[in-house]
Structures are given as C-alpha cells and as structure tokens.
Amino acid sequence: MSVDAPVSHRLRAATRDDLEFQFRLYASTRQEELAAAGFPEAMRESFLGMQFEAQTSHYSLCYPSAEWLIIGSGGEDAGRLILDRAPDHLHIMDIALLPGFRGRGIGTALLRQVLAEAAEKQLPVRLFAFTGERATGLYRRLGFESIMDDGIHTELVWRPAK
C-alpha cells in the first residue's frame, strides 16, 4: 500500500453506547477554537458538554430521519457521519474524524460515497461548514460550490451532472 492510498473504513449505525465517543469526537473538533479564544481549560469540558447536547438535540428534533453513522477504521471508531436524505437533496449534517484519522483519505472516500448516491438519484448534496475551515478546500475540490457565506458559516452545494 502506498503512503497516499486512503485508509479503508466501514460505517455502522450509531447507538446510545456511542455517546461518549461522539462527545470525545465533538470536543476534538473544537479544541483549537477554544484554545485560540483563550477559553479557560477548567471550563472547556462543561462548555463542550452543553454545546454537544445542544447540537445533538437540534439534529434529533429538526432531522428525525437522519442517519447517524459511526466511521470505523482499522478496528477503531474514527469519526461520524450524520446524513439526512430529504426528498429533494442529501444533507451532510456532520462529518468529523478524530485527529489521528484526518488527512488519510477517509473523509474524501466517504464524501465520494455520498456524491455517488446523490448522482445516481440525481439529487444535490448540501452541507454547512465554518467559513475558512480546512475541509472547505476538500469540498471545493470535490465540486461543491458556496451558495451562502455569512462570515461564520458557508453553505455549500454539489449538483450532479445532468
């Protein structure tokens, strides 16, 4: 296997037993932001817990049919994908990997899977990202275009070829 070859992955449905892992994953995606903002270390865990609970509740209430999937790689839980299949589009609500699994091709492979499904169904794919976040470059390379940017969030859409 070459160094550039993507690491294989698997998907499985998330269960209640995965909540601790999902919190740890969520916290890993916010650490740099909180450190850069000077957020006191002692308050981070509590703050992250509240934010994680708010995000989980929002997604569950607003997107009750969304699929919550745990990404596995090499026998370990590596991340999660939350995907809502609306009648007129696919919505990637969240895609996140633990730091040790980033930059290994897993996210790209997952996104390509979603795009292949959308292309087959002739549906667009939507997602939101923080403006300027590293993954935005990946989304653009895969054909996503920005349709809204409020300075904090960017909404991106991918459209299948006709």
Spell out what each predicted region is.
Residues L98-R104, T131:
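Active-site acidic-Proline motif in GNAT/NAT acetyltransferases
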Residues I106, L123, F144:
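Short phosphate-binding/catalytic loops that engage adenosine nucleotides
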Residues R12-A14, F128:
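Surface-exposed loop and edge beta-strand positions of immunoglobulin-like domains
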Residues H89, A118-F130:
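Conserved GNAT acetyl-CoA-binding A-motif
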Residues G103-A116, G137-R141:
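Conserved acetyl-CoA-binding loop-helix of GNAT-fold acetyltransferases
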